[in-house]
């Protein structure tokens, strides 16, 4: 309880997907039964995979999750060591442009929000709430500038990250306007569903009440 959820961006459901190779025989979510599926353990893509399994009418035990970081997962995916891959941008965009995989489902298809959060230590939050407000205002301002000047934003991000400009352009296309604010009730409820699912899978040792670890700042004057 030393960490608090202090900020969140709007959902990005189009920025994550469950992929199979374009020549894969697997066509539906139900085809995942018994398959080896790469995913980063505990990530937003892990929850996407949980939702995919549920949508297919399967149990978690019906699949074989293979826990890999994105770079290792892509290598395994391309050499067919795994049958499918649950992943998010920009790795999703990079793979899409490089090898044209088939998308079995996106976060939008599966009602998986793919939220992004900002966390801070409770003592810092209590001592410096105004710093967080300034930070969120500046992040939101930067996002507005990126939305208004996409070509410039793409070049800056590509130069900084080393990603191909085409990859950056694709993932920015899928990224909605993303001002940062304190997590609201809908976002907290979304994250509670993730926490409950991860507890059920044994990824976290005990139940978590997300609302108890969300920053509740005083209203701005």
Regions found by a protein language model. Give the residues of each.
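Pocket-lining segment of extracytoplasmic ligand-binding domains
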Residues: 62, 66, 71-159
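Phosphate-coordinating loops and pocket residues in cytosolic domains that bind phosphorylated ligands
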Residues: 34, 97, 215
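Conserved C-terminal helix/tail region of periplasmic/extracytoplasmic solute-binding proteins
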Residues: 196-221
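Secondary-structure end/capping motifs
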Residues: 126-205
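Short, glycine-/small- and polar/acidic-enriched structural segments
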Residues: 1-59, 64-67, 83-89, 104, ...
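Short phosphate-engaging motifs
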Residues: 14, 25, 44-45, 73, ...
């Amino acid at each position: 309880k030393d960490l608090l959820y202090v900020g969140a961006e709007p959902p990005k459901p189009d920025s994550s997907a469950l992929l199979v190779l374009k020549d894969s025989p697997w066509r539906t979510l139900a085809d995942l039964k018994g398959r080896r599926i790469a995913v980063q353990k505990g990530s937003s893509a892990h929850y996407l995979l949980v939702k995919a399994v549920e949508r297919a009418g399967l149990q978690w035990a019906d699949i074989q999750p293979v826990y890999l970081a994105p770079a290792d997962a892509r290598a395994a995916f391309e050499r067919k060591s795994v049958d499918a891959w649950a992943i998010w941008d920009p790795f999703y965009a990079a793979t899409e442009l490089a090898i044209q995989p088939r998308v079995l489902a996106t976060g939008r298809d599966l009602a998986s929000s793919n939220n992004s959060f900002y966390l801070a230590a409770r003592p810092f939050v209590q001592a410096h709430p105004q710093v967080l407000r300034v930070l969120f205002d500046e992040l939101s301002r930067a996002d507005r500038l990126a939305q208004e000047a996409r070509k410039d934003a793409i070049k800056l991000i590509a130069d900084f990250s080393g990603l191909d400009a085409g990859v950056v352009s694709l993932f920015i296309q899928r990224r909605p306007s993303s001002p940062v604010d304190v997590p609201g009730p809908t976002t907290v409820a979304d994250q509670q569903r993730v926490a409950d699912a991860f507890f059920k899978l044994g990824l976290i040792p005990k139940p978590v009440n997300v609302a108890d670890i969300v920053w509740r700042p005083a209203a701005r004057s």
